[in-house]
Amino acid sequence: METNSLENVISFEALYDSMHKCRKGVLWKDSVASFYMNGIERTMKLSDELHSGTYKARKPVRFTITSPKPRDIASITFRDRVYQRSLNDNAVYPTMSKSFIYDNFACQKGKGTDAARNRLKEFLHRYYRKHGHDGYVAQFDIHGYYPNMSHAVTEDLFQEKLPAEVFSMVKTILNEQYEGDTGYNPGSQLIQIAGISVLDRFDHFVKEQLHAKLYIRYMDDFLIISDDKEYLETCKELMEAQLASIGFELNQKKTRIYPLKDGIDFLGFKFSLTNTGKVLMMIRPENVKRERKKLRRLVTKSKRGEIPLEKVDESYATWRNHASKGNSHNLLQRMDAYYNSLWGEDYADNYQQRHESKRPRKAG
């Protein structure tokens, strides 16, 4: 059966598999648990509605989050998420991703933030071998990427690449859930795929016409490394024009050309190339400050009995695991000491002792 076959998207088997994928990490939600407990019946009903043409997507629930920065979120129902996941995995993503450049790293199998960071390290090592540690970085950020995404541009891109029956399904979802001429919200995989696809032509322009060899993009955060500042100025001008042609503007506060020696802020870390060619990856100071503030709040709540100690440990462990991906040995030692100090003498075991006690012992 062809990957883009309609049946490969809306069959019971495809939707049931999608349900299992969608429930990971969210089974604690009542709506998800209810659907999952009646999974066979609910999935059969969903498949029947899609086959008969009676399926209608429900309006997303919209809300705003404030951390780490204010952002509007649209959350779709679990039922709609199951369908969209199947449509994405079995039809949209396999087709749209065929033309992606290698250095487009968001929301793809085998890619992600870790892969993007490793690629930037590789670029810096490659640059040092050819040019040394002096150079320039052109770093770009698009103002209001998802809110300003053109519906016409997005639909044209999908229509160009997808089979007619698949495009019809995609267009129906987009039109039912998003009104007006611009603006999407990354509350579903389909919109995330739109997010990494809408700049596909732009990526090829940068790589093939501007000949930017050390170019990397993660959604709307992208950069070029070069030894030629004038070349980067020209790139910026031409790239800005290309983006304007599809309805985007650069965020001028975050878009700049600067010396490589200043270090590169990218995906939560600051990358520095030393004069010996070593690449250092350090977590941003503001991230550390934000985590310390969060820990103070969580520990206070735990001491009042509002949340269990284990939940606070889990939260810190998540941040610690993220920070440990960089050159953070000394920082982590200081953070461990700070975290333990928040609990005080009332807690006999420190974080490391609690953490070690949970590790399985070796046999023998």
Where do the language-model regions lie?
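Reverse-transcriptase-like RNA-dependent polymerase core
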Residues: 48-69, 82, 163-177
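Non-catalytic, polymerase-adjacent accessory regions of viral genome-replication enzymes
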Residues: 1-44, 361-364
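Glycine-/proline-rich flexible loop or hinge segments
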Residues: 22-33, 63-74, 101-103
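Conserved polymerase palm-domain catalytic core
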Residues: 42, 49, 118-219, 224-242, ...
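Conserved pre-motif C helix in the palm subdomain of viral-like polymerases
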Residues: 70-101, 181-207
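Right-hand nucleic-acid polymerase module
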Residues: 76-77, 85, 140, 173-180, ...
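Active-site-proximal segment of RNA-dependent polymerases
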Residues: 2-5, 88-140, 144-147
